[in-house]
Amino acid sequence: MNFETQVNSSASRNSVARNNYEQKSRATSLSLPAHMSCSYQESELATDTQERSQLRYITANTDTEEQSFPVLQALNTHTEELNLDVLLQRADHLRMNEFSKMESFELLWDHKEKFRDEIEFIWRFARAYGDMYEISTNTQEKKHYANIGKTLGEKAITRAPMNGHCHLWYAVLCGYVSEFEGLQNKINYGHQFKEHLDKAIELLPEEPFLYYLKGRYCYAVSRLTWIEKKMAATLFGKIPSSTTQEALQNFLKVEDLCPGFSKINYMFLAKCSMDLKQTEDAVKFCDLAMLLPSVTREDKDAEDEVKKISSTLKR
């Protein structure tokens, strides 16, 4: 059973409409990444990737870790001291650009000793480890980033149980950690994911990203095998249940709150509509998906899936 949330760049990065939404909702303190300009050149991306790949790894031990994990060493040896508000604003701003997430992580890393007890810093640092999980292509590194981020997330929700951002990113990181676990632990993390996602929605009811995640959860649960449902019932006393219709409603909620949220949200809208035999809607969502630029690998994967759906619908 795959409970991974797939909180990748294509899920939380959006179109021009998403940029407008973020400007309106900046006061929520949750800065989700936005689409880059379509004029960003492939050569620039390649150069940036090559430079990043040359970074040295160091080993760090923090009070949130029980073992050593590799983390990226900052590119700049000189660290500019920032106050908390300026630091958070700068980290959020960097993260809005898909190709500056690593720089945002480095900035937070450089200030972790100074602000390690500040809640607004902690949940962002946990989120940044989730970003590094997405950026890394090495399985062991991804596992390390997921585990550190989850530990930071636990610290955040313990200290600020009424902060929706803490619950959001803890849920996300539970999804990432679950990718390296067996079936029983996957089910356990899926349960935690749902629990904290629901709490985040209660605290942040207007945040579209949460409904995207809820849609993904519902879609995955609707496709559980009998043995997976049986094991979940054994662990938690009840069988998890959801439907494609419920998944569709959550993806539609995303579109209602922020039209053009992401290519992958349109892809799932098309998937759900096709499964429910709502052919006209499926075609519409495929067309809308193709109008959005494909910036990241996940965008390209979503576009490939949309093309397959379109081909199926034309038969």
Where are these regions (language model features)?
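Short coil/linker segments at helix-helix boundaries
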Residues: Q89-R90, L94-E103, R127-M162, L168-E206, ...
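Boundary/linker segments of alpha-helical solenoid repeat arrays
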Residues: I119-E120, G164-H165, P208-F209, T244, ...
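Structural helix-adjacent loops and short alpha-helical linkers that scaffold large soluble proteins
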Residues: Q140, Q278-E280, R297
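C-terminal transmembrane module of eukaryotic multi-pass membrane proteins
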Residues: C258-Q278, A282-C286, L292
